[in-house]
UniProtKB/Swiss-Prot annotation:
The glycine cleavage system catalyzes the degradation of glycine. Belongs to the GcvT family. Residues 1-29 form a transit peptide. Its main location: mitochondrion. This is Aminomethyltransferase, mitochondrial. NCBIfam families: gcvT, PRK00389.1. It comes from the Eukaryota.
Amino acid sequence: MRGGLWQLGQSITRRLGQSDKKTIARRCYASEADLKKTVLYDFHVANGGKMVPFAGWSMPIQYKDSIMESTINCRENGSLFDVSHMCGLSLKGKDCVPFLEKLVVADVAGLRPGTGSLTVFTNEKGGAIDDSVITKVTDDHIYLVVNAGCRDKDLAHIEEHMKAFKAKGGDVSWHIYDERSLLALQGPLAGSTLQHLTKEDLSKMYFGDFRIIDINGSKCFLTRTGYTGEDGFEISVPSENAVDLAKAILEKSEGKVRLTGLGARDSLRLEAGLCLYGNDMEQHITPVEAGLTWAIGKRRRAEGGFLGADVILKQIADGPAIRRVGLFSTGPPARSHSEIQNEKGENIGEVTSGGFSPCLKKNIGMGYVKSGLHKPGTKLKIVIRGKTYEGSVTKMPFVPTKYYKPA
C-alpha cells in the first residue's frame, strides 16, 4: 500500500534485526548533501535516529530500539513515524470528483464527505502508477497522499491530465501541501494517546474517516488510517508545529508510544499484507493482479471511465494470468526477485517482498504466481542464492489487522 518505501524496502527487510545500515545508504543516494530533510530531522538525530537516504530524503531507519523491538512495540503499544517525505495535496472545484475518477479506480463520487479509501492511479494499459489513500473532504474538495518515491511522476501525471480537463471547461485546481508535515501514530494506544491532545471525540471516528480539527493547538488534517495493520492516524500538521506535536504525543503516552523508523514500518506493512509500490506493485501490474479488485467500486466496474479500464474490467471478468499471494518459506528469508517454482522445479513466479516476521517468528513474503497456483496451501519452492527451499502459499494478512470500525 503506502509509505513510499520504494527503493528501501528490499534492503530494510534483508537486514531486519541487524545493525549494518551502510549498504542501505549506498543503494539509494550517493551524497548526503543532496538529500532533503524533514522539519523533524534534528529531533530524530537528538533521539538517536539512524539516518539513511531514502527517495531523496534523509530519514530514520530506526532509533535506539532494534527493528524487531520496534515492530513488536507497535503491535503491543504504539509507534510514531515521521512520514513527511510523502506528498499531500488537495484537488478542489465542482468537477474535482469526475476529474479524479478519470485517473483512479475508486468510486470517489460514492464516498461520503469525511470518508476515504485506498485507490490506485492507473495508466492506459491498466498498470499501477501508484497507490494512494484519497479522502472526500466535501463534494468539491478531495485530499490525498501519494508515495515519496512516486511524487514527481504522480504530480506530472495529474498535472498533464488536469490541463487537458480544464481546457475542456472542467473546474478543478490543486494545492500541494509542502508547508505541512505528516506524522503517523499507529498501534493500540493511538486513540487514547491522541485523545489527550484534542477535544474532538475520536471514539466516533472510524477507520477511513477524515476530520479537520485542532490537535495540540494546531489545525490538523486527521485521517484514521495507516500502513501497519493497526489502528492509528495520519496527522497533517503545519510544519512549524510538527516537532511540538511529536513531543506531545510521546509525552502523553508516558513512554509507551515510541519513535519508530522505516525499518519497522516495512516489517509491519509486510506482516499486514500491504503492498509496497516499486516491489509488490509496478506500472506493469494491474490492481486485479495485485489483489486489489475490492478497491474498484461496483459502479466503476459497470461504467469504467478510468485509464486502462478495458484491460482491468476484462481481467475481472476472465481472471488475471498472475496473482499476488502470501508466502511462507523455510531457510533464509526470501528476497525480491527470488524465483518461485512448482514442486517439479518449473518457474511459476517471483517473490516481490520478503523478510523475517518479528511477530510470527518465521519467514514471510509476497510474490506473484500463475493463476491456479495461488490457492492457500499450495506447495512450492523458492530459490535463494542458488539454493532451493520449501515454501507454500498462505492467506494474508499474516498478522490480523485491528482497524477501528463500528461494532
